[in-house]
């Protein structure tokens, strides 16, 4: 397959350079049949490539037929408005995986999915369509989603099956059940990530329960994230981790939608943040790797752009020649795994594009890095006997150039450093939580407490000054019923208490109405503003203060609410199961797959080189 893609790329390159239009005479006659001149062209190109003439002729004929189909489709689209979509089917299908499908663009995504399933013999409910690196939305029209004429559509199956399984009803039923489970799993993933992202955006959850909500730099310390970007970043990281979990299990068809969702949310974050951490660069590699493992790399039109972006992000994050990384960590051995994957994918992409020289350069770089990163299994065993995990052993040995003693010291030191960092981060979160609780105890809303502490960089005294200077902050929406001390009118007792403090009775009553009967807040605000209320505060909030009426349905809904909570807990726990405990899990790899693929593609390139030398 890879060799055929190389041949197609080289022949396409030759045709472009020689300005040959295969869909015109003398290569195509008036009946759109192949012309005699095509055989001469195949002979000419096979001599240039030192390839079998029949194979070259066959590929050129395929290119000619595709060109005619595309031209016919273009004419048809101009006259009728019926667009052509190039459909790439799953690898398991033995028939030609690139197929053309005609459709109007005003139909919905669901109708297109149904049409693809019917045309190519797939089960509609168990496939997903990816167009322009986005999942096709079933409820929107193709036009609304930017689907255009001649677009590429990749079909992903939610099940792993073989042809003989389709002949057996029992096996097919099992596959359908498996697909249903995977679809439910995807939906739970989305729900769980939304819950975690919401918690992260609120930044008020218990630090004991939220170690998974942090994003850290190369030292392991948490990075301060603007509230406006926090939710998007958490969703991006969550989808990325879930996608990586599927990648580890080699479930590429399910991994890809998660990775594409992660890419979408990362794009909502500022450039400065993405340059601070390597997450975004790693995601680009994972997306290209996923397309490659699905044997659909040609569907990813911007594979080169993604790989270049990853390389640029690594440079911004790690510094020129990894200098910044070495300065921070003392080594860059573990991160070299990422560069091995980068060079390998660049080599594969160049080979598929017909660029043998560039392909060999990148593949050779990957091979050299593999030799450098290869780990003697006996050294891993030595570290396992010392009580370290296999993952710690691999990472430690790569960080210490394979020296077992140095690796043991490195792992121990790293454990101690991370334990200290976690202790400091935990204490910082604990203080923040205490400050929020303190402000809530004074009558301020959770939302107001969060925002003012963020504005005051966590300083409680400064936060109190801000709140007293801007009492309208207390009016920020808060859905926590614990802080909802609403009453229609203040009690005479509370009015008298404020009058006793020296405030005017009418002003005292107005302040108590504004602050929902909270004497402490009313007194603080009046004292801070010279005995009067700030003009920006609403003085007639009765409509918003009336307590919600209690109905019999409220108590009846308790069971339903409990069920929802259980479902949320299940969704969150499923996400947490795939969040790796080790913060450098993404740097850990046995490199077994990479070793095989490097050898495979180098053999293709070296065979081409040896064939060229013989001639």
Swiss-Prot record:
PROSITE patterns cross-referenced by the UniProt entry: UBA
GO biological process, one term: regulation of ubiquitin-dependent protein catabolic process
Domain UBA: 374-413, 424-470, 489-529
SUPFAM superfamilies found in the cross-reference section: TPR-like, UBA-like, Ubiquitin-like
Alphabetical UniProt keywords: Coiled coil, Nucleus, Repeat
Assembly: Directly interacts with NEDD8 and PSMD4/S5a, a member of the regulatory subunit of the 26S proteasome. Isoform 1 binds to NEDD8 more efficiently than isoform 2. Interacts with AIPL1. The interaction with UBD via UBA domains facilitates the linking of UBD-conjugated target protein to the proteasome complex and accelerates UBD degradation and that of its conjugates.
Protein name from the UniProt record: NEDD8 ultimate buster 1
Organism in which the protein naturally occurs: Homo sapiens (Human)
